[in-house]
UniProtKB/Swiss-Prot annotation:
Pathway(s) where this gene product acts: Porphyrin-containing compound metabolism; heme A biosynthesis; heme A from heme O: step 1/1
Keyword Translocase carried by entry: no
Pfam families xref list: COX15-CtaA (PF02628)
Extracellular topology ranges: 30-64, 114-123, 185-218, 271-275
Organism of derivation: Macrococcus caseolyticus (strain JCSC5402)
Identification of the protein by name: Heme A synthase
Catalyzed reaction equations: Fe(II)-heme o + 2 A + H2O = Fe(II)-heme a + 2 AH2
Summary of the function given for this chain in its UniProt record: Catalyzes the conversion of heme O to heme A by two successive hydroxylations of the methyl group at C8. The first hydroxylation forms heme I, the second hydroxylation results in an unstable dihydroxymethyl group, which spontaneously dehydrates, resulting in the formyl group of heme A.
Length: 300
């Protein structure tokens, strides 16, 4: 019983850590702190503790520290999960996903520091860390046996909801990548208005940065319409299943918050707190959609 309780605490701690890794990565990009330690990795300016620590260096060091702690925590969680709940069919798959993608995340992060990758490669960093977070999040739900609490094993889902959920989860990943590309290509303020690029002018983007920005907005708009439709379909037709009804209700709230913070990012000239909330909401939404995929795999 004590071991089970300790595993639950470890899984919660690791999930929160992974969330901080996500937000920390966004903070590094938004504050221009990616070069805070120069081209040195894992050292900072060639030293274990640099003598001069400006704000950018402090942010980069903090992100590296949290990422390193998360790597250790995920490794320990994976070992204990296989030992104590390895009999559950999803455990090993989620463990391999958690550990594999956090190592991939670390390697891409190191490569970005040492060899100055372009924006298209750097955008993968956020996406890969998102998969690792989602795997840890699902592993935590598995440890807490959330499915049993919501009677999720008794779900009967029609092919329509299954197809839409899988499609949404795949599509949102491309939306997230396009958003990360906006950050890394420094195209956040390429358009001065919202939702159009120029106020009152419905014209095509005029340069690369506007194309990056408007491509992300277009994909985000499609995602909003699609998820809204699926959420109301699920709440109307699956009201007897709390996990579906309230799960999609939360998903709808998160996508509304995501769109709102996206617009506010433009209106506030990329306010740091708004930008970090924007990254937080999409992380939570992606994790929730991945949970729906887990439910689909168990439903009749």
């Amino acid at each position: 019983m004590l071991k089970e309780k300790n595993l639950k605490w470890l899984s919660l701690f690791t999930t929160v850590l992974m969330l901080f890794v996500q937000i920390g990565g966004a903070l590094v990009t938004k504050t221009g702190s990616a070069d805070g330690c120069g081209s040195s990795w894992p050292l900072c300016h060639g030293k274990f503790v640099p003598t001069h620590i400006p704000k950018e260096t402090l942010i980069e060091l903090a992100h590296r520290g949290v990422s390193g702690l998360a790597l250790l925590s995920v490794t320990w969680l994976v070992i204990l999960s296989i030992k104590y709940i390895g009999h559950k069919k999803e455990t090993k798959f989620l463990c391999y996903m958690s550990i594999g993608f956090i190592f991939a995340q670390a390697l891409i992060g190191a490569a970005a520091v040492m060899w100055q990758q372009n924006g298209f490669v750097l955008a993968l960093h956020f996406g890969i860390s998102l998969i690792s977070f989602s795997a840890v999040f699902l592993l935590t739900l598995l440890i807490f046996e959330v499915d049993q609490k919501f009677d999720a094993t008794k779900l009967i889902l029609q092919p329509k909801l299954r197809r839409h959920t899988i499609g949404l989860t795949s599509f949102i990943y491309f939306v997230i990548y396009s958003g990360a590309l906006v950050r890394h290509e420094k195209a956040s303020l390429a358009c001065s208005s919202w939702p159009l690029c120029r106020k009152g002018a419905f014209i095509l983007p005029q340069n690369f940065y506007e194309w990056v920005q408007m491509s992300h907005r277009t994909l985000a708009f499609i995602l909003f319409i699609w998820l809204t439709y699926v959420a109301f379909h699920a709440m109307r037709n699956y009201a007897q299943y709390r996990v579906i009804k309230y799960g999609y209700m939360i998903a709808f709230i998160l996508i509304c918050l995501q769109v709102t913070t996206g617009a506010l990012t433009i209106f506030t000239a990329v306010n740091l707190y708004i930008a970090l909330l924007h990254a937080l909401f999409i992380t939570l939404l992606f994790g929730l959609l991945c949970y729906f995929i887990l439910l689909i795999s168990r439903a009749k």
